[in-house]
Structure formats: structure tokens, C-alpha cells
């Protein structure tokens, strides 16, 4: 029986194969609805048993995206924030691990009054509660992406919960969007619809009839195939959307709009119909497709074989380029290859900037230090993020301050000079006496910026700024005097002065040598590039033009 719903719900499912771009499609649709004046929020349901991705290998899962409130979430939450230009919270990412943990805890507390606890209704009710918690008088549409592929065992409780929500809030308040692959068979010379038909049949077998289907392919999709899918899957022709690969992820909203998906959704859900305001997004697309300059940035990391491990970093670099109408080419450099001066010279030859991203563990650290040394000695613009800042401190301590045994306790617990140490409230975690998951210094924290520094200039003269963090280690306060005496500028600290947040070199010594303990990439937007990345790309442009070489 239908009930009054303050928000409309749109569920996004995937079929045939994973990695079809459900998150990007959902984000693009969200952007279109927002550009029509609607208030949109988004959520991702992940079917894995981990409570969150915080302890997962980046090679398996990609980056961990941290929200303002300190949640470690799926990388798709980053897409949602960037496309909607909004800040989401922990409620935006729900996992099977969270659901089962909550249900089991309630059972132990006696909350089920002696019931036999089962997947239906207890697990599905918990899932529904998490989805409906996104409802608000301030939200017109909740877009919920259901991770995995239709047919996966792990996804079944989430799909059942979504089916029940449609039943409870009424079909006029709920929309199902299915994203499916049309594979191209070279011997036949055509795209095939049968896998999509089977995928929709699997959805219908569990009680879900999609309202629209987004067809993914590596080439244009003929109208005749769209008509066939409409007939065989019982979906209106206007609800069958062709979405071939686009030149840029930022083109996807235009593709979906040309196919009429946003208008179809608005009509089906009875939402207020307004024209799309393209002003902001057209400016982004103009900067994407009509750059006036070009720079190459070396991203020196441990997980470069899977670019998704650094997704927000690469998007922030590109957005920094948009601010200067500059195409940013990323050179992926495995940090192990920069261990020697010769290796660093070879790998970084011809780049206009070097970025050292975050990470964990000792592998590849000496290569990061080698890349930092090369950039510092050759005046190449350098930006260090989280672990990147810590490696910059290690390199400077060794090669400039004369502390040859300088290291981090994360990599060497017997380091002669532990210039990077374990945070006081993290020692029990490192010792294995407390849970590892969800216990780092996570979320939005403020920092005070020192006057007459590069970082303060980049932030527009602000005395205090807030950025998201994810770390257990910090620059050791015991070594701050010797580092500063050697010329390193500690340009930002926590409000109580106890934690180093930013380090840099004076610009008369190096054009751009800046490290941050935070993760500024997590707050960058294509429509609002982050000031640190804007400044970094500006320095790279100057270096490219031969005007950024330091005198001293």
C-alpha cells in the first residue's frame, strides 16, 4: 500500500557485467536533475561484507573516499560529490557488513523480542531503513545505486529491499533505472541485445520491472536495437537510452540529456518540469575540450597499475587544469623506479610537476623519497599529499638537515631519527590492541596557516582552512626545530599547534615545494577546482615556460 513520501526514490541497477559506469551514469543523471532546479542526494549500496573499504587493498577496490564526517566510503561517493557539487555523509554508503553488524547487535540487545532473525524481514528492513533515512523535506530525489550485478547472490537482499520500497511508497514515487551492456561481436559485425534481455528477465523474476534502460556500448547504438530492447524488455521507447563511450566523463550528462532520460524521469515521477540550466556545466565542457595549454604531471605512486586507486587525485589535477584552460597529462610512475638518482632522472624527465599521493606501507617509499629529491634539486614543482608530505619531511631531514637515519616509524620502528611518528592516540592500534578499521584520524579538521607563506597565498589569505584527513602518523614535534633550522617552513598546523598540517620551502628557494597532511583532492570539484591544485598547475605552467626555475 502506497504511503506519502517526502522524497522520490530512483534506484540504479547494473546487468551483464560490472564496471559499466553505474556510478558515473547515476552522477550524471543527478547533475541533470539538479540543473533542472531539483534537490538531489545520492547513496551507494555495496554488497560486500566489509564494514567499509578502509582496510581493503587499493588494487581490489580503488581509492577510499573520505567524507566530512570521517566515513571511509566507495570511490563512487566521490563521483556523486563532484558531479552534484555537494558534501555527502556516512549515510551515503551502506555495506552488507554494516547491515549485518547492526542486525546482529540488535539481536544481542534483545531488540527482536525472541524472533528468529532472518534475511527477510530483518536484513531487508535494516536496508530499507538506511535507504529511507535519506528522505528529507529538503530533498526532492534520492538516487540509490545498488552495487554489483543483477544475479549476484550478494546483491539479492538489496534488490528485494528496493522492491519492497516501491511497494510501500507507491510506483509513482519510485523509479528503476537499469544499466546494461550491449556487447559487440566482431564476427557478426553487430551489437547483441540478448544479454540485456536476460538481465532484465532476471530483474523481473525478483519482482522489479525497470522503468528505463541505459544501454552501454563501445560504439553508436542503432534505433532499431533500441526498439527491439523496448519490445522485449517491456520498457517504453523513450526509456531506452543509448550511452556509448564518451570522450570525457563530463560529456555523459549531455549524452543522457540528448537521449531524453532526465525528461523521462521527471515526467514519470511527477516532478516539477524546468529547463536544464547548462551555464555552469557548459563552462566545464568548454575547458575540457578547448584547452589552450598543456602540462605533464608525474604521479609517483605505489598503486599506479590501477588508476582508480588515485581517482580523486587525477580528477583534482584535471580540475586544476580547467582553471588555467590547460590539459593535464598524467604520467604514471611506479615509485620503485625512482629509488636511484638515475631512475628518478629517467622516469621524471620532461615532466612539469611531480605529485606524491597518499598510501600505506614500506613498499616503494625509497622511490618516493628519490622522486622528491629529484624534484627539489631540479626546481620541479612538487605537491605532496598525506604520505607525500611525510616523505618530503624524510627526504629533507636526510639530505638537507643531515639526519641520515631519518625515517618514519611506519616503515622502520627502530629508525635512528623518527621524524615521522605514530600519533599518540594510534599507538594501541599499531600495536594490534585495538581495531584497525575506522580508527584513523578521519574527516574534516581545521588548520591554522602561517602568514607570508605559499599555502596561505593559495588559500586566498585565509587564516584557517579545513580539509579532510586519513592518517595514523604525523611529523614528530621533537624534530620540528631542526627541520625549520635547516630551512623547511612549517606553514600550517592544527589549531592547538600540536600537529604539522603543511610544509613548504620559500619560493626564492623553490618555485613550488608544498606538502599537506590532508587530502585536498577530496574537496575538489570540476566546477570549483581546489586552490592547491590550481596553484600547482600554475607552477607547472610557469616551469613549462621556463620561468619557474628557482634562483637559489
From Swiss-Prot:
Residues 296-546 form the Glutamine amidotransferase type-1 domain. CTP binds at residues 18, 152-154, 192-197, 228. Keywords: ATP-binding, Glutamine amidotransferase, Ligase, Magnesium, Metal-binding, Nucleotide-binding, Pyrimidine biosynthesis. The active site is at 386 (nucleophile), 519, 521. Its EC number is 6.3.4.2. Residues 1-271 are annotated as: Amidoligase domain. L-glutamine binds at residues 359, 387-390, 410, 472. Pathway: Pyrimidine metabolism; CTP biosynthesis via de novo pathway; CTP from UDP: step 2/2. UTP binds at residues 18, 192-197, 228. Allosterically activated by GTP, when glutamine is the substrate; GTP has no effect on the reaction when ammonia is the substrate. The allosteric effector GTP functions by stabilizing the protein conformation that binds the tetrahedral intermediate(s) formed during glutamine hydrolysis. Inhibited by the product CTP, via allosteric rather than competitive inhibition. It comes from the Bacteria. ATP binds at residues 19-24, 76. It is an enzyme of class 6 (ligase). GO terms for biological process: 'de novo' CTP biosynthetic process; pyrimidine nucleobase biosynthetic process. SUPFAM superfamilies: Class I glutamine amidotransferase-like, P-loop containing nucleoside triphosphate hydrolases. Mg(2+) binds at residues 76, 145. GO terms for cellular component: cytosol. It holds the Pfam family CTP_synth_N. It catalyses: UTP + L-glutamine + ATP + H2O = CTP + L-glutamate + ADP + phosphate + 2 H(+); L-glutamine + H2O = L-glutamate + NH4(+); UTP + NH4(+) + ATP = CTP + ADP + phosphate + 2 H(+). HAMAP family: PyrG (MF_01227). Homotetramer. Belongs to the CTP synthase family. PANTHER family: CTP SYNTHASE (PTHR11550), CTP SYNTHASE-RELATED (PTHR11550:SF0). CTPSs have evolved a hybrid strategy for distinguishing between UTP and CTP. The overlapping regions of the product feedback inhibitory and substrate sites recognize a common feature in both compounds, the triphosphate moiety. To differentiate isosteric substrate and product pyrimidine rings, an additional pocket far from the expected kinase/ligase catalytic site, specifically recognizes the cytosine and ribose portions of the product inhibitor. Catalyzes the ATP-dependent amination of UTP to CTP with either L-glutamine or ammonia as the source of nitrogen. Regulates intracellular CTP levels through interactions with the four ribonucleotide triphosphates. This is CTP synthase. It comes from Thermobifida fusca (strain YX). The gene is pyrG.
Amino acid at each position: 500500500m502506497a504511503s506519502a513520501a517526502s522524497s522520490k526514490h530512483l534506484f540504479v541497477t547494473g546487468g551483464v557485467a560490472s564496471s559499466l559506469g553505474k556510478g558515473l551514469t547515476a552522477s550524471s543523471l543527478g547533475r541533470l536533475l539538479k540543473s533542472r532546479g531539483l534537490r538531489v542526494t545520492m547513496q551507494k549500496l555495496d554488497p560486500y561484507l566489509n564494514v567499509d573499504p578502509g582496510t581493503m587493498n587499493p588494487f581490489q577496490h580503488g581509492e577510499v573516499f573520505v567524507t566530512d564526517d570521517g566515513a571511509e566510503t566507495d570511490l563512487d561517493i566521490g563521483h556523486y560529490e563532484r558531479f552534484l557539487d555537494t558534501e555527502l555523509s556516512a549515510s551515503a554508503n551502506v555495506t552488507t557488513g554494516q547491515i549485518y553488524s547492526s542486525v546482529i547487535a540488535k539481536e544481542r540487545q534483545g531488540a527482536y523480542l525472541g524472533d528468529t532473525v532472518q534475511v527477510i524481514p530483518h536484513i531487508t528492513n535494516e536496508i530499507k531503513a538506511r535507504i529511507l533515512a535519506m528522505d528529507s523535506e529538503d530533498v526532492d530525489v534520492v538516487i540509490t545505486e545498488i552495487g554489483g550485478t543483477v544475479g549476484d547472490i550478494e546483491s539479492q537482499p538489496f534488490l528485494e529491499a528496493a522492491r519492497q520500497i516501491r511497494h510501500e511508497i507507491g510506483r509513482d514515487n519510485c523509479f528503476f533505472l537499469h544499466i546494461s551492456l550491449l556487447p559487440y561481436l566482431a564476427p557478426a559485425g553487430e551489437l547483441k541485445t540478448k544479454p540485456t534481455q536476460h538481465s532484465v528477465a532476471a530483474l523481473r523474476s525478483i519482482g522489479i520491472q525497470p522503468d528505463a534502460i541505459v544501454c552501454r556500448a563501445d560504439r553508436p547504438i542503432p534505433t532499431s536495437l533500441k526498439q527491439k530492447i523496448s519490445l522485449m524488455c517491456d520498457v517504453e521507447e523513450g526509456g531506452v537510452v543509448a550511452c556509448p563511450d564518451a570522450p570525457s566523463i563530463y560529456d555523459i550528462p549531455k549524452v543522457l540529456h540528448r537521449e531524453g532520460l532526465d525528461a523521462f524521469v521527471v515526467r514519470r515521477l511527477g516532478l516539477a518540469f524546468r529547463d536544464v540550466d547548462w551555464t555552469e556545466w557548459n563552462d566545464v565542457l568548454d575547458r575540457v575540450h578547448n584547452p589552450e595549454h598543456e602540462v605533464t604531471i608525474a604521479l609517483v605512486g605505489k598503486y599506479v597499475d590501477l588508476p582508480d586507486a588515485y581517482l580523486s587525485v587525477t580528477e583534482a589535477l584535471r580540475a586544476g587544469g580547467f582553471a588555467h584552460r590547460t590539459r593535464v597529462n598524467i604520467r604514471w610512475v611506479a615509485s620503485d623506479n625512482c629509488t636511484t638518482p638515475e631512475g628518478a632522472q629517467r622516469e621524471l624527465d620532461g615532466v612539469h610537476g611531480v605529485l606524491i599521493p597518499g598510501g600505506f606501507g614500506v613498499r616503494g617509499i625509497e622511490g618516493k623519497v628519490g622522486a622528491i629529491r629529484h624534484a627539489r634539486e631540479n626546481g620541479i614543482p612538487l605537491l605532496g599529499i598525506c604520505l607525500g608530505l611525510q616523505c618530503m619531511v624524510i627526504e629533507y631531514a636526510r639530505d638537507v638537515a643531515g639526519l641520515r637515519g631519518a625515517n618514519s616509524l611506519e616503515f622502520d620502528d627502530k629508525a635512528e631519527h623518527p621524524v615521522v611518528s605514530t600519533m599518540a592516540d594510534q599507538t594501541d592500534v599499531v600495536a594490534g590492541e585495538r581495531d584497525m578499521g575506522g580508527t584513523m584520524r578521519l574527516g574534516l579538521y581545521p588548520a591554522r596557516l602561517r602568514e607570508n607563506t605559499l599555502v596561505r597565498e593559495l588559500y586566498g589569505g585565509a587564516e584557517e582552512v579545513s580539509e579532510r584527513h586519513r592518517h595514523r602518523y604525523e611529523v614528530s614535534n621533537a624534530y620540528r626545530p631542526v627541520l625549520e633550522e635547516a630551512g623547511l617552513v612549517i606553514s600550517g598546523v592544527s589549531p592547538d599547534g600540536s600537529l604539522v598540517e603543511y610544509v613548504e620551502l620559500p619560493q626564492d628557494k623553490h618555485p613550488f615545494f608544498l606538502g599537506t597532511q590532508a587530502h585536498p583532492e577530496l574537496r575538489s570539484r570540476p566546477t570549483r577546482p581546489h586552490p592547491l591544485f590550481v596553484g600547482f598547475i600554475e607552477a607547472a605552467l610557469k616551469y613549462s615556460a621556463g620561468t619557474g626555475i628557482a634562483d637559489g
